[in-house]
Amino acid sequence: MGIDTPIRKSEKLCICIHCGKEFKRKPGYSNKFCCVECEHSYKHAQKYALIIIGDASIMRANYNPYPFKKDILEEQGGVCAICGMKPEWNGKELIFILDHIDGHAANNKRDNLRCICPNCDSQLDTYKSKNKFGDRYYYRYGKDRGQVG
């Protein structure tokens, strides 16, 4: 009764590397995070930091930059990067579009990404596949720049 029992590895106290909260490690779970939300938030912040510095490991053609749309919109002050429109139109929420400034879908560097309103997007050269034979087409189908079709 008064004897100290050794702490099992599964009952080890750990500190969450995201929020700093102390927690008991559960068997089969990571001992770095107290909950799934902390793990996702931490990994999201790490990946966004790679986008900010332009790390090549995150700049792949098959990498999806859309989870960072909210972060990019916050950096822009919550308005369209071109016209400055707020995300509201006639009392309804306006969904902004994540745009690659140079039109290259594989270039996911932070300085090439911006959030724009649908009106500004429709005025760009890349709207609705107008750049159909741009770099994405040649990347996917392996065509030479001189060939079309």
Roles of regions detected by a PLM:
Residues 1-74, 124-149:
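Secondary-structure boundary/linker elements at domain or insertion junctions
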Residues 32, 78, 104:
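Glycine-centered loop/turn positions within well-structured domains
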Residues 12, 76, 109-111:
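Residue-level preference for short coil/turn positions at secondary-structure junctions
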Residues 111-119, 145-149:
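Short Fe-S-cluster ligation motifs
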Residues 65-96, 117-119:
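Short cysteine-rich loop/turn motifs with clustered Cys
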Residues 34, 98-99, 120:
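Single, functionally critical "micro-switch" positions that shape active/binding sites
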Residues 85-115, 130-136:
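Histidine-centered nuclease catalytic patch
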